[in-house]
Amino acid sequence: MANISYKHFTLGVEEEYMVLDPKTCELKSHDQKIVQEGQKIIKDKVKAEMHQAVVEVGTDICADVDEAFIDVATLRKTISSIAEDLDLWVGASGTHPFSHWESQMITEHVRYNEIVNELQEAARSNLIFGLHVHVGMETREMAIHIANSARYFLPHIYALSTNSPFWEGRKTGYKSFRTKVFDKFPRTGIPDFFESIEAYDNYVKLLIKTNRIDNAKKIWWDLRVHPFFNTVEFRVCDIPMTVQETITIAALFQAICAKLYKLRTQNLNFIIYPRNLVNENKWRASRYGIEGSMIDFGKESEVNTRVLIYELLDFVSDVVPHLGSQHYISHVHKILEQGTGADRQLKVYEETGSLPSVVKHIHENFLAGL
């Protein structure tokens, strides 16, 4: 059997941060001051988002997980330092625990104006913070096949990322309420199966032809073949509280892609499960995080979510050494033992009864371990 090259499984990581008022712990519309100052240092690696209380950063194309860690850590430290100079805080959580979207300003930009004009309150209320991970692909044809199979694992990784238990001052009962907010948008959630890249491209062409979208970036699925880069883009996760959690999740997505690629080169295929079944597990991940159970479709039974995540680690264990990501993958055990960002937010609230204390905890952990 020919040796498999893993070099094309590059990584790109995008994070969305909340901008905070240190005095009130509320979200703070900052008129893009952080972005303007950031672009003097890190150029286009920092960008404005639709709401002024959001800052988006993105890494370079990283050859491996070590590079991604260094890049994300540098971005977090840079943005945090700029914010501090402006008497602001930054933090990483899928939703803000108590700020209301109505009081936040929209960034003046043609693209955002178009989205708000079309989607109205669904867009204005979309005050959420996510993590996007790009994994490099050999070809677009391979990308669509890997995306089809990788859909099954989205709930597992989503459960590890859950970090948004509060919304507008209330405990939602969910470990991740962020996706419940985002579901108001069209073209979100688990994507359909596409038998080929041509089938996907034809779908995009139809939407453009019928004036639904102007380009494929307005397809906001939990996973998509990126319209401009040769990557599979994973978009399901909440922004994790810490850098270590972000890179652990990125390493898992990379390992899943590498394993599915390895199977395909051996003329083996992972089972393609229907979207409606994967959605069942996604809802469970949103509601319970790692504390609940998911459906094992093969056994047709409920299985503890932690057990399924351990099975995922076994599934990718043969490719992880080739990717050099063992250290980061091993952090999954710590998350499973100590809880996700949502679990930690809820613990602080139970101990203090104070949502501002939760925000302070989020801010204090933004640079944890760096």
Annotate the PLM regions.
Residues 102-113, 173-186, 282:
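Short, low-order "capping/linker" segments at domain edges
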Residues 124-150:
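Internal, well-ordered domain-core segments that constitute the primary functional module
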Residues 109-130:
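Acidic, His- and aromatic-enriched active-site or binding-groove loops in soluble protein domains
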Residues 45-50, 83-96, 121-128:
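Short, flexible active-site-proximal loops enriched in glycine and acidic residues
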Residues 87-104, 168-172:
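Short, glycine/charge-rich beta-strand/loop segments that flank catalytic centers
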Residues 22, 88, 93-98, 131, ...:
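An acidic- and aromatic-residue-enriched active-site/binding cleft used to recognize and process polar
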Residues 1-86, 115, 182-370:
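C-terminal accessory/tail domains of diverse enzymes
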Residues 139, 147-194:
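An exposed, glycine/acidic-rich loop-and-rim segment of catalytic or binding clefts
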